[in-house]
Amino acid sequence: MSIYEKLKALDIVLPPVSTPAAAYVPFVQTGNLVFISGHIARKEGKPWVGQLGKNIFTEEGKRAARAIAVDLIGTLHAAVGDLNRVKRIVKLMSLVNSTPDFTEQHLVTNGASELMGQKIGRAHV
């Protein structure tokens, strides 16, 4: 099954590349590697705001991380033209805005890791 068939089965429609909010480019390709700039979570087209442990909690954080992963996949598609050419996700880095006593950052980040690894099947993150 191709990546596009997997995305369709998950009801995922790839978004266009987000417009950079500052002086950076969405991605850089060098040789057979693509480096993607950071993305922010969006909910209904607007930044997904909140702080984990204060006004949002683990499950919502996982949904936000998954939303970022969908955006990242859309950017990767724009970079390579065909996601089936992607052999592997080498690194997925996550920055989680949380209170000092919040300890489930790893579970939040899993929202992105699970989509890329278990569902799409290209990650070894």
Language-model features: locations:
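Short, polar/acidic, helix-capping and beta-turn segments at strand->helix junctions
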Residues: 1-124
